[in-house]
């Protein structure tokens, strides 16, 4: 039963550094550029206490709305009751990383553009929309060496 309700209460494993990731923070963390409109993930780095967001925001994805020298402002939507509340959180860059949530979409856009150019050069039309997977091919099941088995439920038996 916890008794303290501090800002970092019950974060023993949440703010833990990863395996073999202890020690000094990599320089690449500070060399990344963030622009307004970038989609970022908040991942708290337990080694840096300054600019640390509340534990609720750990693992959340938001949009950068403000950039300063050592921190970024992130816009996050928090579920409160039956509505979404817009939260603006100022976080140091050690606790933020670029999100990969749009990478699949951007790769698909590039692939579609290449397909469109190729089809235009050949004078053909191409289907660029994703299609659902078709149903499995029809086939016959042989019972020659594969006898059907009838399954019955096992009766419940109490052993007291």
From Swiss-Prot:
The keyword DNA-binding does not apply. Keywords: Cytoplasm, Ribonucleoprotein, Ribosomal protein. InterPro entries: Ribosomal_eL21, Ribosomal_eL21_CS, Ribosomal_eL21_sf, Translation_prot_SH3-like_sf. One of its GO terms (biological process) is cytoplasmic translation. It comes from the Eukaryota. GO terms for cellular component: cytosol; cytosolic large ribosomal subunit; preribosome. GO terms for molecular function: structural constituent of ribosome. It is found in: Cytoplasm. The keyword Ribonucleoprotein applies. Residues 114-138 are annotated as: Disordered. It holds the Pfam family Ribosomal_L21e. Belongs to the eukaryotic ribosomal protein eL21 family. There are 2 genes for eL21 in S.pombe. Component of the ribosome, a large ribonucleoprotein complex responsible for the synthesis of proteins in the cell. The small ribosomal subunit (SSU) binds messenger RNAs (mRNAs) and translates the encoded message by selecting cognate aminoacyl-transfer RNA (tRNA) molecules. The large subunit (LSU) contains the ribosomal catalytic site termed the peptidyl transferase center (PTC), which catalyzes the formation of peptide bonds, thereby polymerizing the amino acids delivered by tRNAs into a polypeptide chain. Component of the large ribosomal subunit (LSU). Mature yeast ribosomes consist of a small (40S) and a large (60S) subunit. The 40S small subunit contains 1 molecule of ribosomal RNA (18S rRNA) and at least 33 different proteins. The large 60S subunit contains 3 rRNA molecules (25S, 5.8S and 5S rRNA) and at least 46 different proteins. This is Large ribosomal subunit protein eL21A. It comes from Schizosaccharomyces pombe (strain 972 / ATCC 24843). The gene is rpl2101.
């Amino acid at each position: 039963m916890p008794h303290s309700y501090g800002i970092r209460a019950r974060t023993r494993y949440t703010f833990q550094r990863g395996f073999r990731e202890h020690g000094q923070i990599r320089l690449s963390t500070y060399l990344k550029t963030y622009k307004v409109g970038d989609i970022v993930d908040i991942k708290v780095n337990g080694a840096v206490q300054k600019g640390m967001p509340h534990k609720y925001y750990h693992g959340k994805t938001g949009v950068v709305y403000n950039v300063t020298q050592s921190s970024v402002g992130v816009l996050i939507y928090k579920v409160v009751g039956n509505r979404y509340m817009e939260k603006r959180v100022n976080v140091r860059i050690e606790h933020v990383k670029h999100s990969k949530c749009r990478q699949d979409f951007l790769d698909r856009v590039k692939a579609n553009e290449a397909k469109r150019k190729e089809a235009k050069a050949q004078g053909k039309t191409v289907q660029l929309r994703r299609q659902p997977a078709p149903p499995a091919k029809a086939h016959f099941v042989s019972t020659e060496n594969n006898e059907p088995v009838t399954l019955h439920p096992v009766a419940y038996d109490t052993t007291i």
